[in-house]
Amino acid sequence: MTARLKLRQLETALNEVEVFETPKVLLEQYPTRPHIAACVLHTIETSYGGLDGRIVADLGCGTGVLAVGARLLGARAVVGFDIDPEAIETAKSNLDDFGFCNEDTEGFCDLVLCDVTQTYTTLFDKECEIGRTEDYSRFSGVFDTVVMNPPFGTKHNRGLGLFLLFCTIIGKNS
C-alpha cells in the first residue's frame, strides 16, 4: 500500500503542529513527537491500509498531532477525544490551520471533550463532562482505526486499561 505522503513529508508537516505551552503533568500530557507520530501513522497506512478513506478516532488527542497526521494520510473522518478543554482548543486550532475544519474540505473532523477513563459508565449514563447530555453509544463500532498516545499511569495508576477498553467499544474490529 502506498501512503499519500512519504514519511519525511509527513514528519515535516507534523512539525508545524502546535504543542502544549504548559503540559499538565497530572493529565500526563507528554507530546507525541512529530517523528514518532509520522512513523506510527505511516506504518498504519502502508502496512495495514488503516487510514486512507477510513474513520479514525484519536483517544487522548491532546493537541491533535495524530488527528492531523491521519487526515494528511487521507482519513475520511477523524474524531479526537480529550479531557482537557485547552487541549481541545489547540487541537481545533491545529486542524483549522491545516484546513481540515472548513466546510469546503472533503472529509470530517470533530473533537469531543470527555474523560475517556469514565466513558465505560458514561456510554450508558449519557453524561458528558461539558454540561450537555451526550450519547456515547453512537460511537459504538463506528471507527475503522483508533490511534492514541494514552496516559500510562505514571501519575495516577489508571488510564491505559480504560483507554484500551474504550477502543474495544468504539472500534469496528476490536
Indicate where each model-derived feature is located.
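Conserved SAM/SAH-binding loop
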Residues: 63
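Conserved glycine-centered beta->alpha loop in an early N-terminal alpha/beta scaffold
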Residues: 60
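A short SAM/SAH-binding and catalytic strip from SAM-dependent methyltransferases
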Residues: 144-157
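Conserved SAM-binding motif I beta-strand of class I
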Residues: 77-82
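Conserved short alpha-helix immediately C-terminal to the canonical SAM/SAH-binding motif I
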Residues: 86-87
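A short glycine-rich, Lys/Arg-flanked "PGG" loop and its adjoining helix->strand segment in the class I
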Residues: 162-173
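S-adenosyl-L-methionine
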Residues: 1-57, 68, 72, 90-141
